[in-house]
């Protein structure tokens, strides 16, 4: 049974996913359908968490929206709604989950990682 699930999941996995980690700044291109027309919306922010495995893998992106309000979105990595993921900047952090950034006020500075 487990073997059959893996075969079906393999069919829906995306191939062109860039390597990114928590702390990286990413630009996610999301397909939005409004009525009869379709457009691409860009959401740029810091990856604060990655979770799951296989086709159920998700990542959380946080950015500071208008009026200083924090906005977080959870994206499934293999979703057909996510058109493209671009890594804008690689961040150097020592945690897998950056939930502490929710409580930080002002400009968040994360050092840049040099690979």
UniProtKB/Swiss-Prot annotation:
InterPro entries: Ribosomal_bL19, Ribosomal_bL19_CS, Ribosomal_bL19_sf, Translation_prot_SH3-like_sf
Example GO biological process: translation
GO cellular component annotations of the record: cytosolic large ribosomal subunit
PROSITE patterns: RIBOSOMAL_L19
UniProt-recorded Gene Ontology molecular function terms: structural constituent of ribosome
Record's keyword terms, sorted: Ribonucleoprotein, Ribosomal protein
Family listed: Belongs to the bacterial ribosomal protein bL19 family.
Protein's job: This protein is located at the 30S-50S ribosomal subunit interface and may play a role in the structure and function of the aminoacyl-tRNA binding site.
NCBIfam families listed in its UniProt record: rplS_bact
The name this protein goes by in its record: Large ribosomal subunit protein bL19
Organism: Thermotoga maritima (strain ATCC 43589 / DSM 3109 / JCM 10099 / NBRC 100826 / MSB8)
């Amino acid at each position: 049974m487990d073997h059959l699930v893996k075969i079906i999941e393999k069919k829906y996995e995306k191939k062109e996913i860039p390597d990114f980690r928590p702390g990286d700044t990413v630009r996610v291109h999301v397909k939005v359908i409004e009525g009869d027309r379709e457009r691409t919306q860009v959401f740029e922010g810091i990856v604060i968490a990655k979770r799951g495995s296989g086709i159920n893998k998700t990542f959380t992106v946080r950015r500071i929206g208008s009026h200083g309000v924090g906005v977080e979105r959870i994206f499934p990595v293999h979703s057909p709604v996510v058109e493209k993921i671009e890594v804008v900047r690689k961040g150097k952090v020592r945690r897998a989950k950056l939930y502490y950034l929710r409580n930080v006020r002002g400009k968040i500075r994360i050092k840049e990682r040099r690979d």
